[in-house]
């Protein structure tokens, strides 16, 4: 509806509201000035969002909150966010796993899935523990004993999925670990290890690199972006997707460690 009000028999059209309405209406709001991102956590994507926010200044709003994969998809299905980051197991199985996961949520027929990058997922530990694993004085599965304190992620996070699958291979469950509690982001998890509150947690290699911690790789995973089709061509969404192929951004990813950008920006699935 056109933004207007009627005063003493005359229609008034506030310019600011009218301009905003025109932008929203034109090409599905291609110049819309808001991009809200939820879902899985990633240090490099945080850098991209921070850089975009700094360049955009007060002209647009871009925000990224790490809710975990499943909560992010729930928020997207209700229209609360414009993009959701997901990772749900091994990269070689992502072509089947990710669409199957999306199809559990209402609205998925209006979604498109874009490959951001592959990254290494594993155990984040202190450098001392990593050195012990590297020289084979400790086997990774020994970290399952009750003496080691685990930092967890919230239920529905992709990291918890990866951890559960690794534990299953060793006839273990999450409930059998000595847990210090759930962390709401990979950064919070890594921070608890860096401060000595926990000994180990499951997160990406880049998160370990950001905090100068040790890393024990478990698998390669596909980190992908879910975007509603009707907002896919908006300016902010396209800026973020183009940033994934930027040489400077990829250089930062190489410094953090564990990234593979060979398929960045490719569409891998579209709802029907």
Each model region followed by its residue ranges:
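Short helix-start
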Residues: 3-25
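N-terminal segment of the mature folded domain
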Residues: 30-31, 45-130
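Short loop->beta-strand "edge-of-pocket" segments that line small-molecule binding or catalytic clefts
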Residues: 31-41, 138-163
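Short coil/turn segments
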Residues: 37-43, 89, 121, 125-133, ...
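Short beta-strand-to-loop elements that line the ligand-binding cleft
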Residues: 60-68, 174-186
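A ligand-binding cleft/hinge motif common to bilobed small-molecule-binding domains
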Residues: 87-102, 190-219
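Periplasmic-binding protein-like
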Residues: 107-122, 209, 213-242, 263
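Flexible hinge/capping segments at coil-to-helix
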Residues: 116, 125-150
């Amino acid at each position: 509806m056109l933004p207007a009000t009627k005063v003493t028999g005359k229609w008034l059209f506030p310019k600011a509201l009218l301009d905003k309405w025109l932008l929203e209406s034109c090409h599905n709001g291609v110049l819309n000035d808001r991009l809200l991102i939820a879902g899985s956590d990633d240090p490099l994507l945080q850098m991209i969002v921070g850089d975009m926010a700094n360049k955009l200044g007060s002209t647009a709003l871009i925000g990224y909150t790490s809710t975990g994969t499943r909560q992010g998809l729930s928020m997207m299905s209700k229209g609360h966010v414009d993009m959701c980051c997901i990772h749900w197991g091994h990269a070689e199985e992502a072509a089947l796993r990710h669409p199957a996961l999306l199809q559990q949520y209402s609205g998925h027929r209006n979604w498109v899935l874009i490959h951001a990058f592959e990254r290494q997922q594993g155990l984040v530990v202190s450098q001392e523990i990593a050195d012990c694993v590297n020289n084979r004085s400790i086997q990774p599965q020994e970290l399952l004993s009750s003496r080691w304190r685990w930092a967890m992620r919230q239920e529905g996070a992709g990291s918890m999925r990866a951890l559960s699958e690794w534990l299953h291979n060793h006839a273990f469950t999450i409930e059998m670990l000595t847990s210090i509690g759930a962390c709401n982001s990979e950064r919070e998890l890594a921070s608890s290890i860096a401060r000595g509150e926990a000994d180990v947690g499951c997160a990406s290699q880049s998160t370990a690199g950001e905090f100068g911690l040790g890393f024990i790789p478990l698998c390669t995973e596909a980190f992908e972006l879910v975007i509603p089709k009707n907002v896919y061509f908006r300016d902010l969404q396209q800026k973020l997707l183009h940033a994934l192929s930027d040489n400077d951004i990829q250089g930062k990813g190489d410094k953090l460690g564990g990234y593979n950008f060979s398929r960045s920006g490719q569409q891998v699935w579209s709802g029907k």
